[in-house]
């Protein structure tokens, strides 16, 4: 890590270089041994329901959740004010109406992510994000393509069953590509 001219320059152990403007940095967390990305876990169940009709195998493959990539196949992207895009290497891309259920076999304390609709939706899309822990509601929020990305940090102490539901909002499934960027659970 090197701080130079208002930017944080990062070189990974694999020799990848990144430059991040400090205005985009909220905090740095070095607790990787206590951190698990949801995209590295297999959900206990995944249920995708189309707005019209019944799910078929081709549609499930097309609209099912993606790990560490967007629905267009590239990195996960969110929009910042002024049209600037932020890219993320870890996370989940989820189309409405999708429910993911994770069975947590270890004791985790926090569930954190940066959330928004994919930058490529160009301001369209409208979903309801619901997160449950042991069937108890932890978060419910409408997310639109016109919103800035937001972070959440949820207490999941004692939770064995974590459910993420991305439900249809007012747009009836059009451009409903929610990105849960850096979605992680920590001990």
List each model region and its residues.
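Gly-Asp-aromatic-enriched flexible segments
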Residues: 1, 5-7, 11-187
